[in-house]
Structure formats: C-alpha cells, structure tokens
C-alpha cells in the first residue's frame, strides 16, 4: 500500500481546524430558559385592552403605529370562538402581515391580537441593544397568553422570526 503524505501547509491547516473545533465545542453556550409555560396574567378580557394600551404608552421612543393592538371581531371585551395572534418578524411590526391577518380575523369572526415583540418598534440610537433570546421568547409567550384570553381556540399566525418563535413554543 502506498502511504499518503501531507504537505506541511495541509498539516498546519488540519491542526488549526481541529483546535478551532475543540475551542468551539468547549466554548460558552447561550443560556436559554427551557420553561415554555405561558405566564399567569393579571388581567381579564374586560381590562386587557386598557392594560396593553397603558403599557405601550410607557415605552419611550415608540414609533407611530408600532404599538401592540387588539382588534375586536365584534364588541370590545367579548370572547370569540377563535382569536388570532400575529407574531411579526425581526425588526418588523404588525404591518408586516397586513392585510392577511386582518382578512383571516374577518373571515373567522376572530378577535385579533397584534403584539409588538420585545424591543421592536422603538426609535433608538442602538436598536435591540438590550434584546436577548429569553426576552424575545418571553414576549411571544405573553402574546400567546393574551391571545388565549380573547377566545376559546387560538390561531397563531407568524412570519420570519415570529415563525421561529411560534415553532419553538409550539414544540412543547
């Protein structure tokens, strides 16, 4: 059998590759909360809209039309058979899914909750500076919990990053 010999350059490259792989494998790992339970809410269907409006008004630098919003199917404060929660994508807003989510809600006679995901829709010098995966996941969990208050059965609609969040939370 013929012995394969590697040049000095290939040996250095392979050794470097092995070192990089070891450093990567032993390096820091992000700490992600594995608790996928939805938060307990301190609001009722009668007070949810006021609560969300007040919370959004406290956000400094909130861009126009980026606030979380409930669109009632019929009458404010009344549950419907279905509600739709729309989780938007990275750096997007509720308008990313328009007009699809509006038409879906209308077709199903559903209440529609359009949340603003954590740190999104805010005018800042350094956008998303304080955003972490846990904070983003928590805001999606809250959105789902609020949406469940509005209905008997929840329909989750999402795009892009919102889709990743929806799949992650639905996996439990």
Where are these regions (language model features)?
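Catalytic nucleophile-loop/oxyanion-hole region of alpha/beta-hydrolase
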Residues: 122-150, 155
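N-terminal cap/lid segment of alpha/beta-hydrolase-fold proteins
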Residues: 37-79
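Short, surface-exposed "cap/lid" segments of acyl-processing enzymes
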Residues: 63-117
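N-terminal Sec-pathway targeting helices
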Residues: 2-18
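Membrane-interface motif at the C-terminal end of an N-terminal transmembrane signal
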Residues: 19-35
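Conserved hydrolase catalytic core segment
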Residues: 168-172
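Extracytoplasmic/secreted proteins, especially bacterial periplasmic and envelope-associated proteins
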Residues: 95-99, 135-142, 164
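Gly/Ala-rich beta-loop-alpha elbow adjacent to hydrolase catalytic centers
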Residues: 157-166
């Amino acid at each position: 059998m013929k012995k394969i010999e590697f040049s000095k350059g290939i040996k250095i490259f392979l050794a470097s590759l092995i070192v990089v792989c070891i450093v990567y494998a032993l390096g820091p790992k992000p700490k992600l909360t594995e608790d996928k339970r939805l938060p307990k809410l301190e609001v009722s269907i009668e007070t949810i809209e006021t609560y969300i409006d007040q919370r959004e008004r406290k956000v400094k630098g909130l861009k126009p039309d980026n606030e979380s919003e409930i669109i009632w199917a019929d009458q404010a404060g009344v549950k419907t058979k279905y509600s739709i929660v729309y989780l938007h994508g990275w750096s997007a807003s509720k308008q990313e899914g328009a007009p699809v989510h509006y038409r879906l809600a209308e077709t199903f006679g559903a209440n529609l909750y359009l949340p603003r995901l954590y740190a999104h829709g805010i005018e800042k010098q350094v956008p998303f500076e304080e955003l972490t995966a846990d904070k983003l996941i928590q805001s999606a969990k809250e959105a789902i919990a609020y949406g469940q208050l509005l209905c008997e059965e929840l329909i989750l609609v999402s795009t892009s990053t919102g889709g990743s969040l929806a799949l992650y939370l639905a996996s439990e």
